[in-house]
């Protein structure tokens, strides 16, 4: 594309992809970073609007993180144990393993079902309507959980409740998805106040740590009632939320895409909006030309929805990309996230750790800080470097947890297990926990991105269904009672994910979607993407060869 002066915005040429521009883009596009609808207001008001808008955008994933650890947190509350558990000889109550398994497995089971229902709806009607529908359904789920007096009613409530960025900045902003989840997990563990005051307004009420100081049903009601905050925020801000510009471009609604971009960037950035729309159109057209179109007569439609996209994801041209995206997300579950994160408080309680709520608060704080650190590192270090080697380190930590679980004196060994869990959590959140979302979100071709993300969500939920159902049977005293030995199980599954990642994970940092299409179409080995990309840009980085590198020379 020819470079013209009208493509320069704040001294940056947006018609090209250059990693050296990412920090200047980030500085000049503050509105995109903390999106808001307000256009011209005094500076203090604009700042407040941007903060609140940024929090509003992340509300959905904060709610996901909040809900992911709700089962383990509630199971550790005495009032909840008394309401739904069975008495044990020492006079306390214990939640049976099959209750915990069913409660925690129902959400991913419903997530799998909703994925196949919602994915074609989102592709046809856009992303914005889905936010409103999900918020209304979430309210119904919270009501069922709050009013439940039987474990089956609580089960029903748990079940119900269960792409515009520049290439230079994709990793930075996609990492915020994971940080929002981690904040929700942290918020589920600590009462609002102090330096988390702003986020506490989002989370609204005191949660597990604060409610543990109460007695009676409000001890477990308070965390559940706090869930009303999230759909309330989403419904309130929904009228102001713009539709996805990328989706609008794919639908041929260019003028609406420009309007949506103006609302995101601000009216003073008309030039940038035009450049970005052209970039999205070019990527969309190039993706279609490289991957090819299936004849309309060969496509099948169900209720007006294209049913071939999911099958096409596993076709010859897309199979590797689909499996890479699935493994990048599912690898989180395989490496032990469900065990270490989802049941942290309950597991620490079973290990007889004193002040186990405080210990879990510290754990989620470590995870939050590590996830924040992943923001710049994903663009400075790259995706592959931040995932592949750390996955093998995580496997070693799981193996060590398993070994400590075999020590006869478990009261002493428990502190070693806790230390390993903390180290595991830090490495996980700074690596695959944050960057896995980045890779899974950007690896698919633009035309099949929605279908691929649906498959990623369904597969990840399937792993969640399996592990959420089985982990309580592994650790509960009335079942497997494995303790730290459960680390051996996740060491095995994690090693599979680590080895698969070594061969499948490419370096996608700063690579436009169209170039990714070319690299995959050429048959280039994913682990050599960076070298080939640098060769494409005229940068020689292969010291072992005296001739230029061609993509076909790097096929695995």
Curated annotation (Swiss-Prot):
Residue intervals passing through the bilayer: 51-71, 102-122, 129-149, 169-188, 195-214, 220-241, 333-353, 361-381, 387-407, 417-437, 455-475, 486-506
Record has Membrane as a keyword: yes
Membrane topology, record value: Multi-pass membrane protein
Main location: membrane
Keywords of this entry: Membrane, Transmembrane, Transmembrane helix, Transport
SUPFAM superfamilies hit by this protein: MFS general substrate transporter
InterPro entries, A to Z: MFS_dom, MFS_sugar_transport-like, MFS_Sugar_Transporters, MFS_trans_sf
Pfam families: Sugar_tr
Domain of life: Eukaryota
The keyword Membrane appears for this protein: yes
Molecular function terms, GO-annotated: carbohydrate:proton symporter activity
Localization (cell): Membrane
Entry similarity comment: Belongs to the major facilitator superfamily. Sugar transporter (TC 2.A.1.1) family.
UniProt name for this protein: Major facilitator-type transporter ecdC
